[in-house]
Structures are given as structure tokens and as C-alpha cells.
């Protein structure tokens, strides 16, 4: 039937965590029906306890039911990323380390997933391949070594673009130190090797572990 029935719906958390995506859920509900009223009790990046009411939605029952699954999917996905990020952020709170996101995101959802990482207290790495140059193992092999790869890149890169080199051995790391590489990615290294690299970081390069 076309008869409109107004209902009130409550969105509650079912575990402790960090909220992300409240602005998106409002857009989802209003995209289906501009007359739907969404009241957020919290803000993005807030910590939330299990059982807390996060938001209240008032409007036509058909409109709310049509939008709820998409809205909750966004809220759950983004809050999940923010909450998981926050666990790692808290575990390194007394260090100088930072938690960074990667470019390995869900197709079409990169912007909101990177935003969710920031809600959890993390930082964003490159947004895309053109935001900085990462020399990976394939590039090093193709060029015939780290030094040659750096030479090719330096001759062709835009001015002011940062270069990062991915290494997976201590030897490669020490070579990067000798070549004054300012950003070094330690790829799949054990905690023991990472610790060795930190001790040998004589030039004060920024190190990332992946």
C-alpha cells in the first residue's frame, strides 16, 4: 500500500570500538527519502561502549527499511576499520611509531576506508601511485640494483617527489643507508631484523615495516 507509516529506529553498538561513518549513513537515509530525520548521538572518531545508542532515525517505514542495510553496512565496515586501527594505535602509544594505511583498499571505497583509518588514530600513506615513488623489488631487479634504480628515478622524477625503497634484507638496507635513501620500507621482515635495521639507521631515515 502507499499509506505512509512513520517509525522510529535506533542504531546501537554491539561491541566496544571507535565510530566512523555517521555522515555517510545520514546521506544514505536522505538519498532514499529527504524527509527522513537522522539524529547522531555521537561523532565520528568517538569511542563507543557496547550497547550504546549511536543514532536515531525517524521517518517513513518503507524508506527506513529500504536504506537501513546499506547504511549499516557502511557504518559497520568503517567502524570496524577504525576500531581495529585504534587497537594498534593504542599498542604503540608510548613509542614514536605510527600506524599507516596502505593503498590495498576495496575498489570504490578507498576514500572512506582511509578516512576510517584516521578516525582510529592512524595516518594515511600514499593515496595513489602518483603521490610518491616506491621502488619495489621488481624495479630493483629490472634496473640491475638499488643504485641503478635510484639513478633512473632521480633523472625522471618530478621535483619534490619523495622516493622510498622497499628492502627485504639487511644488506639492501645498509646499501640504502650508504646511498642516503630517506624513506625505507622493510618488507616482510621479522621483528629481529627490523630491530637490527633500527639500530643501524645511522642517517635517521624514516623506516616503515610492512
Residue positions per predicted region:
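Short hydrophobic alpha-helical segments of the AMP-binding
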Residues: 201
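Acidic/glycine-rich phosphate/pyrophosphate-binding loops and surrounding catalytic core
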Residues: 1-179, 183, 195-198, 206-208
